[in-house]
Curated annotation (Swiss-Prot):
GO cellular component: cytosol
UniProt record similarity statement: Belongs to the TPP enzyme family.
Metal-binding in keyword set: yes
Binding positions for Mg(2+) per the UniProt entry: 387, 414, 416
Biological processes annotated in GO: aromatic amino acid family catabolic process to alcohol via Ehrlich pathway
Reaction catalyzed: a 2-oxocarboxylate + H(+) = an aldehyde + CO2
Cofactor: a metal cation; thiamine diphosphate
Provenance organism: Nicotiana tabacum (Common tobacco)
Cross-referenced PANTHER family: PYRUVATE DECARBOXYLASE, PYRUVATE DECARBOXYLASE 2
UniProt-recorded name of the protein: Pyruvate decarboxylase 1
Residue span of region Thiamine pyrophosphate binding: 337-418
Protein residues bound to substrate: 59
Keywords associated with the record: Decarboxylase, Lyase, Magnesium, Metal-binding, Thiamine pyrophosphate
C-alpha cells in the first residue's frame, strides 16, 4: 500500500513491528527499491534499555543480537537509522528522510519503543520546514552533451524517441513531452514507462516491446537510423529475453544523471530534465519516422460481441474496460496476464497507469490499489488482477472497504499463476 501511495504522492511510509513486521514487509520494500520509489519504513524497535543486556526478546528468532533486522534491510534500502536515544534522533531521522527523497529509494528507521514517552526540550519547538537543496547539472557537461546529441540526431534521416521508466525518478516527463513537441519525431514508450507520456500526443506510436510491441511500433523503432532512449531499463522482461533489434551505435541513452551517445562519449553530472529541455531547442523538426508509421498503420478491428450465453472472452472484457477509462481514472495492472492485456489499453488524457515490471511480485497490485486510492481519492482506480495473485494479498480488500474506497477490481480467472 505504501508503494501505491508513493506512486500517487511522491513518497510513502509504513509502520511495522520489530522483526515479525519488518521481515514481512521486506518483500514490498524490495519492490519499491526496484521501482525507485521513496518509501520510509518505520519500525517499533526494542526498548533502548534492552540493548547490550543479552536479553532475549519476543518477536525475535531467539538471538540476543538485535541487529539482524537492519542487516536484512541493507540491500533494499539506501539508508538505515537505529534511534536509541533522543539526543541524535532528530539528526538521524532528518538524514533518513532526506536520503529517501534525494535517492528516490526506501529507507529504514527503527525507533526504540520507549522513546516516544520520554519528554525532550526539542519537542516544544515549532517544527522547522523541511527542504532539500536542488540538484544541478554540470553546465559545461550539459552544453557538451547537448551539442553532441544534436549533431548526432540532426544528421539522421528518421530518428525516433523512446521513453523509459526512469523518467519518473528523474522528474523528466514534462521535458520529454517538450522535446517531442519540438522535434516532431515518432515517440514510443517502453512497457514499464506506460503512463509517463501522454498517449493522446499526436506523434505517439505505442509501446516498444520487441516482438510483442504495439502494432507497427517495433518496425518504426528498429528501422530508425537513430534513437534516443530516455531513462530505459533493459532487463529480460522489457527486452523480451534480450531479443531487441537495437544497435548501440545508433542510440543515445539518457539516464537520470548521465548521457551516453552511441559508441562515443559519455557525459556525467547531466540531469535528464535539463538535457531534454536544452536539446529541444537544438533539434531540427523531422517527422519522417512518424510519417512512415502513419503510412503503414492499420487500425485494429474490434472483437465481435459475445452472445448473451457465451463465455466472456478477454478481448471483449478489455474492450469494455477501455470504454470505462477517462481522465479521472488510474489503471493498475498485476504481474502476469494483466500486464499484456493492459498494455493494449489506450490511455485518455490524464489517465494514470501503474505496474511493477522490474520486481514482478505477484499480489503487488492489491496493496498498491489500496495505497493509490487512499492517496488520490479524486481518482477512480481500476485494477486488473489474476486470481492466483489475488489470493496472496486479498486481505487488503477489507481495508479498502473500511476506508470507503470506490475502486473497481476485475478479478480474472486465468486458470493458474500465469
Amino acid at each position: 500500500a505504501a508503494d501505491g501511495y508513493a506512486r500517487a504522492r511522491g513518497v510513502g511510509a509504513c509502520v511495522v513491528t520489530f522483526t515479525v513486521g519488518g521481515l514481512s514487509v521486506l518483500n514490498a520494500i524490495a519492490g519499491a527499491y526496484s521501482e525507485n520509489l521513496p518509501l520510509i519504513c518505520i519500525v517499533g524497535g526494542p526498548n533502548s534499555n534492552d540493548y547490550g543486556t543479552n536479553r532475549i526478546l519476543h518477536h525475535t528468532i531467539g538471538l540476543q543480537d538485535f541487529s539482524q533486522e537492519p542487516r536484512c534491510f541493507q540491500t533494499v534500502t539506501c539508508y538505515r537509522a537505529v534511534v536509541n536515544n533522543l539526543e541524535d534522533a532528530h539528526e538521524l531521522i532528518d538524514t533518513a528522510v532526506s536520503t529517501a527523497l534525494k535517492e528516490s529509494k526506501p529507507v529504514y528507521i527503527s525507533i526504540g519503543c520507549n522513546l516516544p514517552g520520554i519528554p525532550h526540550p526539542t519537542f516544544s519547538r515549532e517544527p522547522v520546514p523541511f527542504a532539500l537543496s536542488p540538484r544541478l547539472s554540470n553546465m559545461m557537461g550539459l552544453e557538451a552533451a547537448v551539442e553532441a546529441a544534436a549533431e548526432f540526431l540532426n544528421k539522421a534521416v528518421k530518428p525516433v524517441l523512446v521513453g523509459g521508466p526512469k523518467m519518473r525518478v528523474a522528474k523528466a516527463s514534462d521535458a520529454f513531452v517538450e522535446l517531442s513537441d519540438a522535434c516532431g519525431y515518432a515517440v514510443a514508450v517502453m512497457p514499464s514507462a506506460k503512463g509517463l507520456f501522454p498517449e493522446h500526443h499526436s506523434h505517439f506510436i505505442g509501446t516498444y516491446w520487441g516482438a510483442v510491441s504495439t502494432a507497427f511500433c517495433a518496425e518504426i523503432v528498429e528501422s530508425a537510423d537513430a534513437y534516443l532512449f530516455a531513462g530505459p531499463i533493459f532487463n529480460d522482461y522489457s527486452s523480451v529475453g534480450y531479443s531487441l533489434l537495437l544497435k548501440k551505435e545508433k542510440a543515445i541513452i539518457v539516464q537520470p544523471d548521465r548521457v551516453t551517445i552511441g559508441n562515443g562519449p559519455a557525459f556525467g553530472c547531466v540531469l535528464m530534465r535539463d538535457f531534454l529541455a536544452a536539446l529541444a531547442k537544438r533539434l531540427k523538426h523531422n517527422p519522417t519516422a512518424f510519417e512512415n508509421y502513419h503510412r503503414i498503420y492499420v487500425p485494429e478491428g474490434h472483437p465481435l460481441k459475445c452472445e448473451p450465453k457465451e463465455a466472456l472472452r478477454v478481448n471483449v472484457l478489455f474492450q469494455h474496460i477501455q470504454n470505462m477509462l477517462s481522465g479521472d481514472s488510474v489503471v493498475i495492472a498485476e504481474t502476469g496476464d494483466s500486464w499484456f492485456n493492459c498494455q493494449k489499453l489506450k490511455l485518455p488524457k490524464g489517465c494514470g497507469y501503474e505496474f511493477q515490471m522490474q520486481y514482478g511480485s505477484i499480489g503487488w497490485s492489491v496493496g498498491a490499489t489500496l495505497g493509490y486510492a487512499q492517496a488520490a481519492p479524486e481518482k477512480r482506480v481500476i485494477a486488473c488482477i489474476g486470481d492466483g495473485s489475488f489470493q496472496v494479498t486479498a486481505q487488503d480488500i477489507s481495508t479498502m472497504l473500511r476506508c470507503g474506497q470506490r475502486t473497481i477490481i476485475f478479478l480474472i480467472n486465468n486458470g493458474g499463476y500465469t
